[in-house]
Amino acid sequence: MADKTPGGSQKASSKNRSSDVHSSGSSDAHMDASGPSDSDMPSRTRPKSPRKHNYRNESSRESLCDSPHQNLSRPLLENKLKAFSIGKMSTAKRTLSKKEQEELKKKEDEKAAAEIYEEFLAAFEGSDGNKVKTFVRGGVVNAAKDEHETDEKRGKIYKPSSRFADQKNPPNQSSNERPPSLLVIETKKPPLKKGEKEKKKSNLELFKEELKQIQEERDERHKTKGRLSRFEPPQSDSDGQRRSMDVPSRRNRSSGVLDDYAPGSHDVGDPSTTNLYLGNINPQMNEEMLCQEFGRFGPLASVKIMWPRTDEERARERNCGFVAFMNRRDAERALKNLNGKMIMSFEMKLGWGKAVPIPPHPIYIPPSMMEHTLPPPPSGLPFNAQPRERLKNPNAPMLPPPKNKEDFEKTLSQAIVKVVIPTERNLLALIHRMIEFVVREGPMFEAMIMNREINNPMFRFLFENQTPAHVYYRWKLYSILQGDSPTKWRTEDFRMFKNGSFWRPPPLNPYLHGMSEEQETEAFVEEPSKKGALKEEQRDKLEEILRGLTPRKNDIGDAMVFCLNNAEAAEEIVDCITESLSILKTPLPKKIARLYLVSDVLYNSSAKVANASYYRKFFETKLCQIFSDLNATYRTIQGHLQSENFKQRVMTCFRAWEDWAIYPEPFLIKLQNIFLGLVNIIEEKETEDVPDDLDGAPIEEELDGAPLEDVDGIPIDATPIDDLDGVPIKSLDDDLDGVPLDATEDSKKNEPIFKVAPSKWEAVDESELEAQAVTTSKWELFDQHEESEEEENQNQEEESEDEEDTQSSKSEEHHLYSNPVREEATESKFSKYSEMSEEKRAKLREIELKVMKFQDELESGKRPKKPGQSFQEQVEHYRDKLLQREKEKELERERERDKKDKEKLESRSKDKKEKDECTPTRKERKRRHSTSPSPSRSSSGRRVKSPSPKSERSERSERSHKESSRSRSSHKDSPRDASKKAKRSPSGSRTPKRSRRSRSRSPKKSGKKSRSQSRSPHRSHKKSKKNKH
């Protein structure tokens, strides 16, 4: 009975409170109507009421004073009432009896009191400060009788939402909703002062907990966003750690990538990460160098070097960093190829790092990939369409323009329009905005914009149909109109216009698919060429080791280990060591140390190390040079003791090599002799080169099929060419050079046999001298023949005496010029062409190459075979034809050359002999007048000579001419012949001048002067006889 009264009072108070809220809705009305008076409660139940009412009073005050600002108390109170009025009063339950209602409420009050007491202890006694203080639902503490017993929400603790809920449009409370009894405020103040102090503390803690809850919700949102992009499971970190990692990402979006570069990043086993951890970076290396080094493997999403910030980090003298690729495949290739590689003298130590967000556009694109994303060059076709051949090979030349319309349409229908996304962000945004309005408003909008922005350079893509921006605009507009998404589109080729070109859309994101195989091969073009060679850093390190090498065991061991570790470049290392031993100024201890290094490397060349055996092979070719240089060093040592010490150390190496059996004993003996100076390496090279040339000609010179001495000694127009293809030429073999075959065979037998190929200059000197001697006498004959030819043309009406004289000169000219090819090979002609130039030899090679090509075509059936001839005969006939053509060309060139030489000599002789021409002619005229008995004239009015002197003179002239020609051919170098030439020269020189003067006069005078020419040799002959006597 004692517990029934509080339930009744609570019911009455709730009714009063409900009516007050509906009537006024003010907080003062709530406070006046919430507390029951003392007269309403029985006296036996009053001792229990202070405890309950005290808690309710505190709870209501907490809810009212919860806001940091007093001016917000009213709307907050209404929201609280709204949020807590969940239980609805139903009129259907009022039929229950008062007794049943009291029993039911008694049980619920006991449960609620126990829960509230626990909450009270937790909130005010500080048992768990981190717990959020909760509110009791309105129907839990003071539920009405008419509430449903089966309500699912009954008995549950309410968790409040954020304090900053939307207060602009609060929903209207329904007529059935009533304020909860939890907010009833008593008029009596609680007797405990300690509770008041705790009340203030709980208000602060409540506000703090709500702020924490807001922060947690925000952290959860950021964590979810990050997990979707980073492919990582949800983390179970504490609130403080999550806040510390996410605060910078809220300040700056790009810093979210950098926050993951924590110093302790390590491989978390994520199979989708593209981020590489670099653990050993040179302090002088920057991000740009990393881009150049790692960008060869694919586009990069981010590059970051963790620069040292403390003295301890700077003391390490190495940095660490991260390089993130756009896709996993490129990152795996970079890890495989660069892990352990020396970059700027630091060995790269790579590993997988934590995944980072991948941006839409990379920060670095490889040049090979950039070329494929660039627009194609101008082609002249509509929309800059590219022919398929040129699209595959951009360096291919442009095709000529089609001649007719059909060819143009065919080329256009097979071409491809390549769409490239513009890289300029402003232009790309403008194109997208334009497409948006054109799709919405129609083509009239595009026409209006073109009319309005005709002078705006930003809208040039609407007018210039060949530009990549217009191609992208046209494709993107078509794609949107066909139903494609702005971010996802179809990538297969299609025709936009009927009978037009194919359009090739851009890939969705080319950087996420990795580099193609062609681009990978382009990126690694230089790798195969570097195989078997030291890198620049390794070469510098080797040179540094050799410069600082001393005869200490540890130093030589370290150098030997370096050589074996880089055995792939054994040849380059051997060359470097050989070069270091060839310097005479090197101190003796360093030379000995380098020789010991050679010995150690040779000893370990049989070790189970990859490519170590290469050292034995490459050192074998260089040891002769090494010991020759050591011999030069040994001879330059001044002190006897020092030289003996040096010698003993070198000989110790020989004894060790003999024990190790690295090389055979004869080779070691040879090396020892080279070092002691008993064998000269240069002489050995010469003796080794002799067997290569035993055949008398190098391999290159045998291309023309003839030995060197035969090629040099025979002119091209009279060459027998016996062994061009191994078969003698029958038609040209017999008497080509005018010498019988037996004589040539005997002369060949008498020739000395050369063990070494004779020099091509040995047979040149005599032939040149002989040719020069012949040419000096030859030009005089040429002058006489030319003069006699001129006289013959001018003196057709001469007498028989002059005709005989000219006939003799004609016969001599015929002997010199009109002979056949076989008669040209006289002694003088043969000696003139004794030396064969390189040009003639080259022509012979060309002829033989043509013959070989002709023979190959005959054998393969490209050329028809002539009936009645074998292959060999047809080839020989072809060779003869080529040689005959070459001979004719050579003869024409020789004639032109001789003609030019004659003209030069004539011009010189004219200038010298014009001065002495007049005086001798007057003397001859006087002599003629004095010797002739009867001055009778000829038929033309001139003197007529007696027949007897004329015949005598003609006979004398013939004899003198024959004797002079004989003396020239037989006694070429005799002094008598020289004196005869000197005496004949004035008469011979006067004759052509007089004949030239006679051309301007009548033929009679020319005839007279031609007779004087015939007498001139006779007189010179008489004078020579007088001189003899």
From Swiss-Prot:
<feature type="modified residue" description="Phosphoserine">
    <location>
        <position position="236"/>
    </location>
</feature>
<feature type="modified residue" description="Phosphoserine">
    <location>
        <position position="811"/>
    </location>
</feature>
<feature type="cross-link" description="Glycyl lysine isopeptide (Lys-Gly) (interchain with G-Cter in SUMO2)">
    <location>
        <position position="80"/>
    </location>
</feature>
<feature type="modified residue" description="N-acetylalanine">
    <location>
        <position position="2"/>
    </location>
</feature>
<dbReference type="InterPro" id="IPR006569">
    <property type="entry name" value="CID_dom"/>
</dbReference>
<feature type="modified residue" description="Phosphoserine">
    <location>
        <position position="485"/>
    </location>
</feature>
<dbReference type="InterPro" id="IPR013170">
    <property type="entry name" value="mRNA_splic_Cwf21_dom"/>
</dbReference>
<dbReference type="InterPro" id="IPR047488">
    <property type="entry name" value="SR140_cwf21"/>
</dbReference>
<feature type="cross-link" description="Glycyl lysine isopeptide (Lys-Gly) (interchain with G-Cter in SUMO2)">
    <location>
        <position position="829"/>
    </location>
</feature>
<feature type="region of interest" description="Disordered">
    <location>
        <begin position="1"/>
        <end position="110"/>
    </location>
</feature>
<keyword id="KW-0175">Coiled coil</keyword>
<feature type="cross-link" description="Glycyl lysine isopeptide (Lys-Gly) (interchain with G-Cter in SUMO2)">
    <location>
        <position position="832"/>
    </location>
</feature>
<comment type="similarity">
    <text>Belongs to the splicing factor SR family.</text>
</comment>
<feature type="compositionally biased region" description="Basic and acidic residues">
    <location>
        <begin position="950"/>
        <end position="980"/>
    </location>
</feature>
<feature type="coiled-coil region">
    <location>
        <begin position="837"/>
        <end position="915"/>
    </location>
</feature>
<feature type="cross-link" description="Glycyl lysine isopeptide (Lys-Gly) (interchain with G-Cter in SUMO2)">
    <location>
        <position position="208"/>
    </location>
</feature>
<feature type="cross-link" description="Glycyl lysine isopeptide (Lys-Gly) (interchain with G-Cter in SUMO2)">
    <location>
        <position position="749"/>
    </location>
</feature>
<feature type="domain" description="CID">
    <location>
        <begin position="534"/>
        <end position="679"/>
    </location>
</feature>
<feature type="modified residue" description="Phosphothreonine">
    <location>
        <position position="719"/>
    </location>
</feature>
<keyword id="KW-0832">Ubl conjugation</keyword>
<feature type="compositionally biased region" description="Basic and acidic residues">
    <location>
        <begin position="97"/>
        <end position="110"/>
    </location>
</feature>
<protein>
    <recommendedName>
        <fullName>U2 snRNP-associated SURP motif-containing protein</fullName>
    </recommendedName>
</protein>
<dbReference type="InterPro" id="IPR035009">
    <property type="entry name" value="SR140_RRM"/>
</dbReference>
<feature type="compositionally biased region" description="Acidic residues">
    <location>
        <begin position="786"/>
        <end position="806"/>
    </location>
</feature>
<dbReference type="Pfam" id="PF04818">
    <property type="entry name" value="CID"/>
</dbReference>
<feature type="region of interest" description="Disordered">
    <location>
        <begin position="704"/>
        <end position="729"/>
    </location>
</feature>
<feature type="domain" description="RRM">
    <location>
        <begin position="274"/>
        <end position="355"/>
    </location>
</feature>
<dbReference type="GO" id="GO:0005686">
    <property type="term" value="C:U2 snRNP"/>
</dbReference>
<feature type="compositionally biased region" description="Basic and acidic residues">
    <location>
        <begin position="239"/>
        <end position="249"/>
    </location>
</feature>
<feature type="cross-link" description="Glycyl lysine isopeptide (Lys-Gly) (interchain with G-Cter in SUMO2)">
    <location>
        <position position="145"/>
    </location>
</feature>
<dbReference type="Pfam" id="PF01805">
    <property type="entry name" value="Surp"/>
</dbReference>
<keyword id="KW-0007">Acetylation</keyword>
<keyword id="KW-0539">Nucleus</keyword>
<feature type="modified residue" description="Phosphoserine">
    <location>
        <position position="788"/>
    </location>
</feature>
<dbReference type="InterPro" id="IPR035967">
    <property type="entry name" value="SWAP/Surp_sf"/>
</dbReference>
<dbReference type="InterPro" id="IPR051485">
    <property type="entry name" value="SR-CTD_assoc_factor"/>
</dbReference>
<keyword id="KW-1017">Isopeptide bond</keyword>
<feature type="compositionally biased region" description="Basic and acidic residues">
    <location>
        <begin position="144"/>
        <end position="155"/>
    </location>
</feature>
<feature type="modified residue" description="Phosphoserine">
    <location>
        <position position="202"/>
    </location>
</feature>
<dbReference type="InterPro" id="IPR008942">
    <property type="entry name" value="ENTH_VHS"/>
</dbReference>
<dbReference type="Pfam" id="PF08312">
    <property type="entry name" value="cwf21"/>
</dbReference>
<comment type="subunit">
    <text>Interacts with ERBB4.</text>
</comment>
